[in-house]
């Protein structure tokens, strides 16, 4: 069996041996070169192997590409490391950082048109190289690699967003109608299947969707077609176990759980985010102030932690910096209030000041960092939940106490009600009530065409009055009951998240 014909690739004063057959198989550049019969491309030294001269490439990049070619384009085990240990090592005197090495590898692979290597890079996109790969894909016109990087950055959006290099790529759009890279990624996070998710200390039991194997899950997802709940497997951080009074909000399709207190200890400032794209929890920067029984609101791509137990200050979390900063405080400390975002501003309603009932609606403008008195109410409300659609705020549950001359009599001040407040017309509407259910200790989420409302605590001893699992349809102004409560449990939270489609996972 004859020895395989080798070719020497010369770059400056160094030569690299490579199989001629594999070179032609893997490199479109050399395949075209040999087929063309170009004399200047076929220089052979007397008595030695054929020599091909290359210019303008880097030695480390070329060596990695040729090692890949010599391996026959083998994909198994080929990983790009800081020094290219897989797919060919780099001499110690050529030690380089991964970004530089990656740049030179893509340059050489693109010049030599080694398509199989460029395709392999699609599976090598990582958090530490996705931004550089995206830049290189733009420079060398590699649409498949660019798309792979975009998909990866969508999945790991906040982790990518806080990297300094991101803002070099994410420059503002140059023409009207153009969308920035940041906006493209943010919009792509809102794709997939909208799913109702419940988080809590589930106990299983007769109300559980089915018997659990081992420990009950900490998160469940709701399947609307069958009206059943299923475990959403994830590793809940130990720091979140038995935490009460925390703030929660959805930002860029991440579920944030922030602050709170532990039954056996004091308040905490820790913050975590759940990424449904990876089904993983991440710890993010902690607040500057430990706080509990406060409101966490997402507005204009940031989070605002508002007030708390005997606390009036407000902090803003910017995921681009992974940092919290104090902003304008509440005019007064508030307790048992609620807050939500509406048309880019924050509205605070109800609760108590240190002296009396809070009858004011407060509005916070993030751009001016200023709180203003928006309106004064005739109805006092506390412990309510709030969500918004366009310019309308929906107030769910709570304990109502009417003070005006048109006070209406009701069977109970804490029955389950839904009211709306239009921030443009400043009109209140009393929409719906359920006199058999309590409006206290609830969690709710806006999901599809309605507001899903659940009790925070349900056990065998919980009365029917305090077992709530209802949907308020905002278009038909009607209640819709559900047959299945997720499970017995405490400290429950319901949210709406986009989960990846099965074909994407």
UniProtKB/Swiss-Prot annotation:
UniProt keyword terms in alphabetical order: Cell cycle, Cell division, Cytoplasm, Cytoskeleton, Kelch repeat, Mitosis, Phosphoprotein, Repeat, Ubl conjugation pathway
GO cellular component, one term: spindle
PROSITE patterns on file: BTB (PS50097)
Single biological process term from Gene Ontology: regulation of microtubule-based process
Induction or repression: Up-regulated during mitosis.
Start and stop residues of the Kelch repeats: 176-234, 235-282, 284-325, 327-372, 374-429, 431-480
Pfam families: BACK (PF07707), Beta-prop_ATRN-LZTR1 (PF24981)
Family matches, as CDD domains: BACK_KLHL42_KLHDC5 (cd18478), BTB_POZ_KLHL42 (cd18319)
InterPro entries attached to this UniProt entry: BACK (IPR011705), Beta-prop_ATRN-MKLN-like (IPR056737), BTB/POZ_dom (IPR000210), Kelch-BTB_domain-containing (IPR052392), Kelch-typ_b-propeller (IPR015915), Kelch_1 (IPR006652), KLHL42_BACK (IPR044727), SKP1/BTB/POZ_sf (IPR011333)
Cell location: Cytoplasm; Cytoplasm, Cytoskeleton, Spindle
Residues annotated as domain BTB: 5-78
Pathway annotation from the record: Protein modification; protein ubiquitination
Phosphoserine modifications at: 43
Function noted in UniProt: Substrate-specific adapter of a BCR (BTB-CUL3-RBX1) E3 ubiquitin-protein ligase complex required for mitotic progression and cytokinesis. The BCR(KLHL42) E3 ubiquitin ligase complex mediates the ubiquitination and subsequent degradation of KATNA1. Involved in microtubule dynamics throughout mitosis.
UniProt subunit comment: Component of the BCR(KLHL42) E3 ubiquitin ligase complex, at least composed of CUL3 and KLHL42. Interacts (via the BTB domain) with CUL3. Interacts (via the kelch domains) with KATNA1.
Protein name, entry field: Kelch-like protein 42
Species annotation: Homo sapiens
Gene that produces this protein: KLHL42
């Amino acid at each position: 069996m004859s020895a395989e014909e080798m070719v020497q690739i010369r770059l400056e004063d160094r030569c690299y041996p490579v199989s001629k057959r594999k070179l032609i198989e893997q490199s479109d550049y050399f395949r075209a070169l040999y087929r063309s019969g170009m004399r200047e491309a076929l220089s052979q030294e007397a008595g030695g192997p054929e020599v091909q001269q290359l210019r303008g490439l880097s030695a480390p990049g070329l060596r990695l590409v040729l090692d890949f070619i010599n391996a026959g384009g083998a994909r198994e085990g080929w990983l790009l490391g800081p020094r290219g240990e897989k797919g060919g090592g780099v001499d110690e005197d050529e030690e380089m950082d991964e970004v530089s090495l990656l740049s030179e590898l893509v340059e050489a692979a693109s010049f030599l048109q080694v398509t199989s290597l460029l395709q392999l890079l699609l599976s090598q996109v990582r958090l530490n190289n996705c931004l550089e790969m995206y830049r290189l894909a733009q420079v060398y016109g590699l649409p498949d690699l660019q798309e792979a990087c975009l998909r990866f950055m969508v999945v790991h959006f906040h982790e990518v967003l806080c990297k300094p290099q991101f803002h070099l790529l994410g420059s503002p759009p140059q023409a009207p109608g153009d969308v920035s890279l940041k906006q493209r990624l943010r919009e792509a996070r809102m794709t997939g299947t909208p799913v109702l998710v419940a988080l809590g200390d589930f106990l299983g039991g007769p109300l559980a969707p089915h018997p659990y194997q081992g420990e009950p899950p900490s998160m469940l997802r709701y399947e609307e077609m069958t009206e059943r709940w299923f475990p959403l497997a994830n590793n809940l951080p130990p720091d979140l176990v038995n935490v009460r009074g925390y703030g929660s909000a959805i930002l860029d399709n991440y579920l944030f759980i922030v602050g709170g207190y532990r039954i056996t200890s004091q308040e905490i400032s820790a913050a975590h985010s759940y990424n449904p794209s990876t089904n993983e929890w991440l710890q993010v920067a902690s607040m500057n102030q430990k706080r509990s029984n406060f409101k966490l609101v997402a507005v204009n791509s940031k989070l605002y932690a508002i007030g708390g137990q005997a606390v009036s200050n407000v902090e803003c979390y910017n995921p681009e910096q992974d940092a919290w900063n104090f902003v304008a405080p509440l005019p007064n400390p508030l307790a048992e209030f609620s807050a939500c975002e509406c048309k880019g501003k924050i509205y605070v309603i109800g609760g108590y000041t240190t002296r009396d009932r809070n009858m004011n609606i407060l509005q916070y403008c993030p751009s001016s960092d200023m709180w203003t008195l928006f309106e004064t109410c005739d109805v006092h409300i506390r412990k309510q939940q709030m969500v918004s659609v366009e310019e309308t705020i929906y107030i769910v549950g709570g304990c109502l106490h009417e003070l005006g001359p048109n006070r209406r009599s009701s069977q109970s001040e804490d029955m389950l009600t839904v009211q709306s407040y239009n921030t443009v017309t400043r009109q209140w509407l009393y929409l719906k009530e359920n006199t058999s259910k309590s409006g206290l200790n609830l969690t709710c989420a806006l999901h599809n065409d309605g507001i899903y409302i659940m009790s925070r605590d349900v056990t065998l001893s919980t009365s029917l009055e305090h077992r709530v699992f209802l949907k308020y349809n905002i278009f038909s102004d009607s209640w819709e009951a559900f047959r299945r409560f997720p499970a017995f449990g405490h400290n429950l939270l319901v949210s709406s998240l986009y989960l990846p489609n099965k074909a994407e996972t």
